[in-house]
Amino acid sequence: GVVTAEQIAALNEVGINRMTAAAAAQADRTWAYGHIVVDEAQELSPMQWRLLMRRCPMKSFTVVGDIAQASSASAASSWSQALEPFVGERFTLDELTINYRTPAQIADAAVAVAREAGYEVSAPRAVREGQWAPFIHRVPPEHVVAETVQRVSDEVALGDGALIGVVCSPAQYTQVARAVMETHADRTGTAEDAVENQVLVLTPWEAKGLEFDVVIIVEPQQLLDDAQGAVGDLYVSMTRPTQRLHLVGTSMPAGLGAEA
């Protein structure tokens, strides 16, 4: 699994047919790497892990990810489950110990939901306790959208300019986005026109990697059901806020407390 000096020299020759290392590796099914770095590794299926392991005979990897954020039903529920079929116990697991973004009360709720779903999730220590536990709003199905709009209105009315993320499943996106925009047209946007807007309506996938002062999750149980029980989309959504979290729906996932 070593690139030779001749291969490196050939790749640096100036010529009309010059290929990048990435293109050469893609074209050559026998190409092997000495070390592979995998980001968002929690998303990989067993077949994808097998493919990578075959390309790295030395089994030398740097793997970065958060098991709880996996959105695929075929993803592993622990790093041991993902890696042991290929390397046994010959891997070192280093876990982050400090959570700088999410207040403890919200982070603990997200961890509780993930653990109830059967995921082995560590709980990094939050640097802030936070003033608010998650707000849980259980309402009849016909009131979910109206309740979501009301939560947005209440947050906007506080007048603190908080950035608000409304997260819902793709199936509900059009209905929720239309309702929020009808009430707050001058301040609402989507992932495609996020700049300058106080309120953004997003799917969990679009919310990944972002942070908001306030997050309102619409039908959190549906996010679990749509992912066939995989907790990633819900966990990602719950860990986006820096201040307040609202969950609006007809039912709530296991691990959450009573209504606020």
Q: Where are the predicted features?
A:
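Structured interface patches
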Residues: N12-I16
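An amphipathic alpha-helix/rod signature
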Residues: G1-V2
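Conserved helicase motor core of SF1/SF2 NTP-dependent helicases
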Residues: A5-Q7, N17-H35, Q42-A260
